Amino acid sequence: DAQLRQQDRTELVRIHEIYKPTMIYVTHDQVEAMTVADRIVVLKDGELQQIAAPDTIYRHPANTFVAGFIGAPSMNILKARFNRDCICIGKAVLPVPELWRQVIGQRRDLLLGIRPEHCRLSEDAAVQGSITYVENTGNQRTVELQLESGENISVTVSDRNADVQNSSGICFSWDDVSLFDVTSGRNIGYIEKGEVFTDAMGS
């Protein structure tokens, strides 16, 4: 069961810390990969998708496959269109910071990724939707919304006192955004400590 698996992961990490062996651990369980590994290799149909530390893979997935595979709920992926200094998600128009404009370059159509825990519910937000489902797991709630564009988005709310039923807008920080090429699904780059990086394959 889930508790036994957690105990096994803890014991495996403890043994590794004591004896320091080189270990290759193969798993389909993303939680095991994130909690046990120093570095993760993500494969799809036998092809390498990304190799990096768990935190890097979580924050800067190399492509939409990795973004969807790592994390539960998985990263929200929304269709977006860049126009001058703004990005459009459905009818919502959001200003794009200068460094992100450098990453985007001449691209127009993009996929914007944002993890559920990095979204905030706000009635006044530019991105609007309607709540379709609320899952309460005790320590947090996951709110599912359908945007005006017809796309679905998940928002994780840890504040037990938050009024999730009367907040249908979604806002987020550009610090938490991932942008992907609409054709290949590849991460086009990211911002880290004020610097622009154009390779999210691994580090």
Label each residue range with its predicted role:
Residues 1-65:
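ABC ATPase nucleotide-binding domains
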Residues 38, 49-50, 79, 152, ...:
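Secondary-structure boundary/capping motif
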Residues 47, 68-72, 139:
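Gly/Ser/Thr-rich helix-start
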Residues 7, 60, 68-69, 122, ...:
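Residues that scaffold the ATP/ADP-binding catalytic core of kinase and kinase-like folds
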Residues 73-75, 84-203:
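Non-catalytic connector elements of ABC transporters
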Residues 59-83, 113:
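C-terminal boundary and immediately downstream tail of ABC-type ATPase nucleotide-binding domains
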Residues 53, 65, 79-81, 128-132:
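Residues located in well-ordered beta-strands
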